[in-house]
């Protein structure tokens, strides 16, 4: 495969400085079609093209010069998808391994910015109880290892802000964490306050909170386990979490 001069994968490795990666296994599979009638979305990045005379090896399709590796990121809030039509995934050394590693790194670098589910208002119970099929993510139950982020506007003069998280009866045998941070998204490594105890029900009390915008987060700690089965990876353990964990949030000021 030959590399485009602007290839972002070059930030991770130089690939021998010849702008090529040689001898990547190809099973006569796909390439990205950018010709007439193409449905490739605008903004798709082209990284590499095939340097391969398929006619010489009696292939059904000529792929020389076609796009072999590409990526797409819809916006700042979405992730990045990086694709290739060949198979570098089983290689354990050299430039082909670097190629696979660079694709993974570029995809991870393209993680979307966190989004806010909504504003928490004093004395209003926010019910996060809907299912994915309801197509209403602002009020959908949380999935395993997910964060849900909310904002909270604290006025001047508040002595205490109390944030209460509750599970839903009959569906509360899960572990949820509750986090708070002033001025920015709350994660485990950055939160000013957090309760990571077992169970769903939590309460955070912020003494003399600074006026302005706070970020409140809920994280589902319960997750599935995996094992190798007859047909590949299987989920075991807490598979019920895959249906989502419903909960409610309420804020009060004193």
Name each region found by the language model.
Residues 1-95:
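Catalytic beta-strand/loop cores that center a nucleophilic Ser/Cys/Thr
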Residues 1-2, 57-146, 233-254:
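Extracellular ligand-binding/catalytic regions of CAZymes and related secreted enzymes
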Residues 88-89, 168, 183, 221:
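Residue-level signature for short turns and capping positions that connect secondary-structure elements
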Residues 92-93, 167-175, 224-226:
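Extended, low-complexity, turn-rich repeat/linker tracts enriched in Gly/Pro/Ser/Thr and Asp/Glu
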Residues 116-134, 138-160, 179-198, 206-254:
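C-terminal edge strands of extracellular/lumenal beta-sandwich accessory domains
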Residues 158-170:
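Short amphipathic, basic-aromatic surface patches that mediate peripheral association
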């Amino acid at each position: 495969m030959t590399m485009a001069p602007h290839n972002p994968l070059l930030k991770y490795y130089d690939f021998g400085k010849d702008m090529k990666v040689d001898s990547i296994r190809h099973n006569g599979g796909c390439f990205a079609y950018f010709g007439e009638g193409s449905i490739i979305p605008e903004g798709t990045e082209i990284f590499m093209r095939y340097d391969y005379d398929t006619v010489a090896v009696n292939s059904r399709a000529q792929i020389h010069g076609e796009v072999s590796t590409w990526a797409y990121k819809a916006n700042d809030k979405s992730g990045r998808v990086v694709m290739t039509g060949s198979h570098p995934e089983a290689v354990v050394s050299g430039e082909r391994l670097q190629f696979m590693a660079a694709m993974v790194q570029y995809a991870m670098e393209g993680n979307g910015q966190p989004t806010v589910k909504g504003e928490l208002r004093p004395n209003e119970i926010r019910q996060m109880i809907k299912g994915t099929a309801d197509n209403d993510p602002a009020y959908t139950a949380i999935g395993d290892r997910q964060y849900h982020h909310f904002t909270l506007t604290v006025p001047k003069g508040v002595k205490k802000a109390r944030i209460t998280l509750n599970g839903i009866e009959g569906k509360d045998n899960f572990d949820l964490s509750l986090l708070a941070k002033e001025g920015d998204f709350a994660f485990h490594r950055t939160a000013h306050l957090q309760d990571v105890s077992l169970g769903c029900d939590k309460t955070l009390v912020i003494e003399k909170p600074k006026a302005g915008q706070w970020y409140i987060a809920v994280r589902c700690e319960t997750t599935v386990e995996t094992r190798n089965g007859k047909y590949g990876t299987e989920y075991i353990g807490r598979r019920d979490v895959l249906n989502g964990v419903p909960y409610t949030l309420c804020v009060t000021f004193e």
